[in-house]
Amino acid sequence: MMVTGCLFLAVAARAEARPLLMISVDGLRPGDVLEADKRGLKIPVLRKLAADGMTASGVRNVLPTVTYPNHTTLITGVFPSRHGIAGNVTFDPKQQNMDSWYWYARDIKVKTLWDAVHAHGGKVASLSWPVSVGAASIDYNIPEYWRAHNADDIKLVTALATPGLVDEMQKATGLALAKADGDTVEADTGRLRYAAALIAAHHPEFTTVHLRALDHVEHETGPGSKESNAALESLDRAIGETIAAARKATPDLAVAIVSDHGFSPVEHDVNLIAPFVQAGLITLDAKGKVTSWQAEPWGSASVAVVLANPKDEALKAKVAKLVKELAAKPELGIADVADESAIAKMGGTPMASFWIDFKPGYTMGADPSKPAVSPGTVKGNHGYFPTQPNMRATFILEGDGIAKKSLGEIDMRDVAPTLAKVMDVPFPGPDGKPLY
């Protein structure tokens, strides 16, 4: 009798858990939702979710404020210094790894929400989430991955996806994977249709979806441009259709709308590579490729400086002197320089001995032959220190039983434990805490 009662209580407690759909709109600034009228944005779906749910005025994200480290913090609740995803691209000063990104889940050094839900007996689904290739705890996975940026990439993604899943989604939606993979609004819309079909067919407890178009357009045309606004309005409609279809299949579905970072307009590229070459810290060949290095700047809107031998105090002193001299030149637009202690407080990778942050409007250029400062090659960027207000990300959580609440500004590390609580899943280990 006691055993039966305990089992009943366990089942009843589990029945209160809500399945969850987390949609990341890469590059979505919180003000685009909270100040939509002021910015001339017609996004009724996102506005209603924010009005009806738990909404942050902004999310303090992690160093660097780029896609892959922040998406990994969203599903782990820890800083990059703990989860191991240091940037978007891997550190590769000699460019021997063909511009490889941190695609592979095996590089995550801590437990994820995917792991927690799977271990608790729940099904997990994911579409184009960063750092998801080979994630064993994702039952239905079409990961984010590319190589040649041509049609063969679709074959690669299909091979890396859960066996049979791409064929199943293509048949269910009538959309070829080529129409649901990439960084266009069309691809994001297709990806959302896949998500709705997947939820209807398999009823996963946890689904993660990454939308890439807004970020892409903001880089090309700048944040708040008419093109960026048009992209967001299109995504708003597609998100609304997806939620409606998903809730038809799973009525108690909770929805989290998140982003990884904000955006800043860019006007200037800064050549940081040339001063390192002139100081004898980097050697380039005739084509401008690195042949040897002692210290390498790595990044864009903020720049990690990695030393070949960080225990070499003479080298560290030489680099510290150079960085100080660069920061003293106002034309370079350097806002701040962090040492190892400050980097550790912001949770950045311990690979970096120094970290240079640019002012809004400035970013590091990629061409060592260009002048010290030249016109920007992109119109918008992110990656600055998370202390910069325009880097704030978005968080909205909505669903039955979730209180309407203005959260103010939150820490990104609080997102994962909050979502674990929504799903009633044990999740030990995060640095953050539930928001309710």
Question: For each predicted feature, which ranges?
Answer:
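Active-site-proximal N-terminal segment of extracellular/periplasmic enzymes that hydrolyze or transfer
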Residues: 15-54
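Structural recognition of the beta-strand scaffold that forms the well-ordered cores
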Residues: 20-24, 57-58, 73-75, 124-128, ...
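Secreted, luminal/periplasmic, and some membrane-associated catalytic domains
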Residues: 25, 57, 64-66, 90-106, ...
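A long, amphipathic alpha-helix that forms part
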Residues: 32-33, 185-209, 214-256, 318-325, ...
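Short, solvent-exposed turn/loop segments enriched in Gly/Ser/Thr/Pro and often Arg
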Residues: 55-78, 127-137, 431-435
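His/Asp/Glu-rich, glycine-adjacent segments
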Residues: 79-222, 318
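Substrate-binding rim/cap in mid-to-C-terminal beta-strand-loop elements of soluble/periplasmic
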Residues: 278-320, 378-422
